[in-house]
Amino acid sequence: MAKSLTDSDDIGRFRSTLEATIASFGLERLSVAQVDQLVEHYGMLCKWNRHINLTRITRPDQAARLHYAESLFGGVLVGEARTLLDLGSGAGFPSVPLAVLRSDLQVMALEASQKKALFLTEVKEALGLSNFSVVRARIEDFDWKQYDLLTSRALDRAEEMLGPVATRLRPAQRLMLYCTPDLIEQLEAETAGGFKTEVHSIPQAESRVVALLSKP
């Protein structure tokens, strides 16, 4: 019989890798309840991924480091923001981990795909995330200016879509990108350096950063 993607060994490996990686990143330790919520999300991700393309990364150790711990790393940069909009949330990164981490933060996941939006809605219900909402829409059709913090981790046509967003930020609004340094350079070139950039290297990640963009 084929082994389940989320058998007890995989769940245990995911949990231990997540907790160890969070500690190695120097992040605040999650509560047992918070880790349980992320484990639940991981199990749903593996199950749904058999039917719709959510991610290529499902191995428990890789998913814990590259999806979950990386998403949580951005949590230290959220600051005093009270509302966050995840542009093209996909499987829920970074929106779901950030909603689990910060119960005081109202998180909206913006997703154009009907199937992925349905997955995120099921995640909200399963995890009991009262501070997490899902809207099915494209970035260009959605009024994002009401949010304190915009974020994106996996966007098709990233350079094409994020350039206009970066140039239209409100003075108090910030854009948090999980990306490579190359993307930041491309955005700076396309927008003639029309914003301030604060770049934080993600620990244990090759050429991956979290960048905060804001109006000068």
Q: Where would I find each of the regions flagged by the language model?
A:
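Hydrophobic alpha-helical segments in the ANL/AMP-binding
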Residues: 71, 96-99
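Conserved beta-strand/loop positions that form the S-adenosyl-L-methionine
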Residues: 87-89
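Class I SAM-dependent transferase core
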Residues: 2-81, 85, 115-118, 122-130
